[in-house]
Amino acid sequence: MLIKVKTLTGKEIEIDIDPTDKIQRIKERVEEKEGIPPSQQRLIFGGKQMGDDKPASEYSIEGGSVLHLVLALRGGL
C-alpha cells in the first residue's frame, strides 16, 4: 500500500509498505530516499510518535495515510 511521509519542509515522500512492516522498516525506506539515518527520524501519525518495533497496522495506517517526519537532532556543547 502507498503511504506518504511529509517532512517539515512540506516535501512528501511516497513509500510502498505492507501493513505488517514495522515502523523501523518505514524509517529505512525514508533513509533510502532521503539519506536521513533512522536514528534521527521520529515518525508521527495521529498525533502520536510511533515505536520502531511495532507494525504499521497497529497504528491503523492505511493506503493514503500521511505520516509526519520530525528530525531528532542531538544537541550538545
Swiss-Prot record:
**Disordered: annotated span:** 30-57
Please report the name of this protein according to its UniProt entry.
Ubiquitin-like protein NEDD8
Describe the function of this protein. Answer: Ubiquitin-like protein which plays an important role in cell cycle control. Attachment of nedd8 to cullins activates their associated E3 ubiquitin ligase activity, and thus promotes polyubiquitination and proteasomal degradation of cyclins and other regulatory proteins.
Q: Which domain of life is it from?
A: Eukaryota
Under the heading PANTHER family, the entry gives: UBIQUITIN
Entry keyword set? Isopeptide bond, Nucleus, Ubl conjugation pathway
Output the SUPFAM superfamilies linked to this UniProt entry.
Ubiquitin-like
Q: Name one GO cellular component term.
A: cytosol
Q: Where is this site: Interaction with ube1c?
A: L8, I44
> What's a Pfam family in this record?
ubiquitin
Q: Does the keyword Nucleus feature in the UniProt annotation?
A: yes
Q: Name one GO molecular function term.
A: protein tag activity
**Entry PTM:** Cleavage of precursor form is necessary for function.
Q: What organism is listed for this UniProt entry?
A: Dictyostelium discoideum (Social amoeba)
* InterPro entries tied to this protein: Nedd8-like, Ubiquitin-like_dom, Ubiquitin-like_domsf, Ubiquitin_CS, Ubiquitin_dom, Ubiquitin_ubiquitin-like
Q: Cross-link position, Glycyl lysine isopeptide (Gly-Lys) (interchain with K-? in acceptor proteins)?
A: G76
Pro-segment residues?
77
